[in-house]
């Protein structure tokens, strides 16, 4: 791809703990357009390079000029060992596998942050009474296989993403039920530390389902996160209680992150779980818990919250990172 992207194709990727998604990207002016976005199960491939080679064969493109791949995990000197998938990925390895002139790894929620201001109203669901704001810094967070967190600093017309590992901060219970959940998770981890990701994720929802019942002195059928969310939507009492508690904890955590990042411009919830439970989330204690910050409740009450419904937000953000402005922001 040349400097203004005319006539060329790039490759973008979004590799999480469960799925690896890829697309070709071309630019219409400064706006990226995704071509043939495709998802693969990570467990079906030995390496990320294998999945990329399969995708390039599928679309019949040999050597896109540049690539940006968003990954779930901390990147160190152009390398990452995935947090929830046993893949080691390097920029050098990507360049060799795809024949790219340049290849860049970015955090998956850095990509979400770059994309958030570009998501249109039809792909957003407002949670609470406040509409989106065109000003102020943003927080982007969300549960999926893990729990991702990023910020977006907006200054003087520039947007600078802030990569974090905020999903691994300690879980802070707010009532007796959540204290019992914390105790149960601590025992399950042999006395280990309980991060918010241990609850606000697909695997975390499965543990929460069991631990909430145990807190009431009873057992419950062990279910997958997919089963819990589906049954909750259908009205199953136990599953609905789990999802409501999940949403409440998500609200508390999102409010804490908004305070930490000073996200006056809004909080965006991304990831695979929130869109599946969106109607429950709207009616849940999410916003009440988000606002409930003691002496700083006035601060959080002024912050809008939205769920991102677009299925390829991280790919859009990776495409933004191919632009000159995006490259500068993630360099």
UniProtKB/Swiss-Prot annotation:
Binding site for ATP: 13-18
InterPro entries, alphabetized: ATPase_NBD (IPR043129), Bacterial_glucokinase (IPR050201), Glucokinase (IPR003836)
Biological process terms in GO annotation: glycolytic process
Keyword Plastid: no
Main location: cytoplasm
GO cellular-component term (any): cytosol
Subcellular location: Cytoplasm
Alphabetized CDD domains for the sequence: ASKHA_NBD_GLK (cd24008)
Keywords, comma-separated and alphabetical: ATP-binding, Cytoplasm, Glycolysis, Kinase, Nucleotide-binding, Transferase
Gene Ontology MF annotations: ATP binding; D-glucose binding; glucokinase activity
One Pfam family in the UniProt entry: Glucokinase
Catalyzed reaction equations: D-glucose + ATP = D-glucose 6-phosphate + ADP + H(+)
Enzyme Commission (EC) number: 2.7.1.2
PANTHER family in the record: GLUCOKINASE (PTHR47690:SF1)
Record-stated family: Belongs to the bacterial glucokinase family.
Protein name: Glucokinase
Species assigned in the record: Caulobacter vibrioides (strain NA1000 / CB15N)
């Amino acid at each position: 791809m040349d400097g203004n992207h005319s006539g060329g194709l790039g490759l973008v990727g979004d590799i999480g703990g469960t799925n690896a998604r890829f697309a070709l990207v071309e630019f219409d002016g400064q706006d990226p357009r995704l071509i043939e976005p495709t998802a693969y199960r990570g467990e079906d491939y030995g390496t990320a390079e294998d999945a990329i080679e399969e995708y390039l064969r599928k679309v019949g493109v040999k050597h896109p000029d540049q690539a940006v791949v968003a990954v779930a995990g901390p990147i160190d000197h152009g390398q990452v060992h995935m947090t929830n998938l046993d893949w080691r990925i390097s920029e050098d390895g990507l360049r060799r596998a795809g024949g790219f002139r340049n290849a860049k790894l970015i955090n998956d929620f850095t990509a979400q942050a770059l994309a958030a201001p570009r998501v249109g109203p039809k792909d957003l669901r407002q949670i609470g009474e406040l509409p989106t704001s065109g000003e102020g810094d943003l927080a982007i967070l969300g549960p999926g296989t893990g729990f991702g967190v990023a910020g977006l600093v907006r200054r003087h017309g520039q947007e600078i993403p802030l990569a974090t590992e905020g999903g691994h901060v300690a879980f802070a219970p707010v009532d007796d039920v959540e204290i019992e959940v914390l105790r149960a998770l601590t025992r399950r981890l042999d006395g280990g530390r309980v991060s918010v990701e241990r609850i606000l994720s697909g695997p975390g929802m499965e543990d929460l389902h069991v631990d909430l019942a145990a807190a009431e002195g009873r057992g419950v059928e062990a279910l997958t996160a997919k089963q819990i969310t589906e049954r909750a939507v259908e009205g199953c009492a136990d599953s609905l209680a789990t999802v409501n508690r999940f949403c409440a904890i998500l609200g508390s955590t999102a409010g804490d992150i908004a305070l930490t990042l000073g996200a006056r411009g809004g909080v965006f919830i991304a990831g695979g779980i929130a869109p599946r439970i969106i109607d429950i989330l709207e009616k849940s204690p999410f916003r009440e818990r988000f606002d409930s910050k003691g002496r700083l409740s006035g601060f959080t009450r002024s912050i809008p919250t939205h769920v991102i419904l677009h299925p390829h937000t991280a790919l859009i953000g990776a495409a933004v990172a191919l632009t000159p402005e995006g490259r500068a922001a993630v360099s």
